[in-house]
């Protein structure tokens, strides 16, 4: 099995479940969130690295290793933020990105022109 470096932005319900499953599969997972409380809980319960900060910040993504990531997953509660995080991750060198988007009118933003 090929193990990946995966960065997950958003340590909410979806992000924490993804982090748990992916770390169980032995992927190298880094969680990014603004909430130190959530990250502390995840850090204590899961085999993950954590970075506290704004996932839409270039500096925070660099600290979290976006430039070396095989996959960046953005699953915060804000569609626009998820798209922005993925755009930044891709520009920094992430091989693949996935943005959680519920508003289908925003889908065109991430499509290649």
Task: Pin down the residues of each PLM region.
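Short alpha-helix immediately C-terminal to the canonical SAM-binding loop
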Residues: 39-40
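Residue-level detector of conserved catalytic or cofactor/ligand-binding positions
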Residues: 105-113
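Conserved SAM/SAH-binding loop
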Residues: 54-58
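Glycine-rich Rossmann-fold phosphate-binding loop(s) that bind the pyrophosphate
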Residues: 11-12
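Conserved acidic E/D residue at the C-terminus of a beta-strand in Rossmann-like folds
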Residues: 33-34, 111
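Aromatic pocket-lining residues of Rossmann-like dinucleotide-binding sites
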Residues: 22, 89
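N-terminal Rossmann-fold NAD(P) dinucleotide-binding loop
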Residues: 15-16
């Amino acid at each position: 099995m090929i193990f990946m470096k995966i960065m997950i932005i958003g340590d909410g319900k979806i992000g924490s479940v993804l982090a748990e499953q992916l770390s169980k599969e032995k992927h190298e997972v880094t969680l990014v969130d603004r909430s130190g409380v959530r990250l502390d809980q995840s850090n204590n319960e899961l085999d993950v690295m954590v970075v506290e900060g704004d996932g839409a910040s270039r500096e925070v993504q660099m600290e979290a290793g976006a430039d070396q990531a095989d996959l960046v997953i953005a699953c915060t509660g804000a569609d626009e933020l998820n798209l922005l995080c993925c755009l930044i991750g891709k520009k920094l060198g992430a091989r693949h990105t996935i943005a959680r988007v519920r508003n289908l009118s925003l889908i065109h933003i991430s499509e290649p022109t």
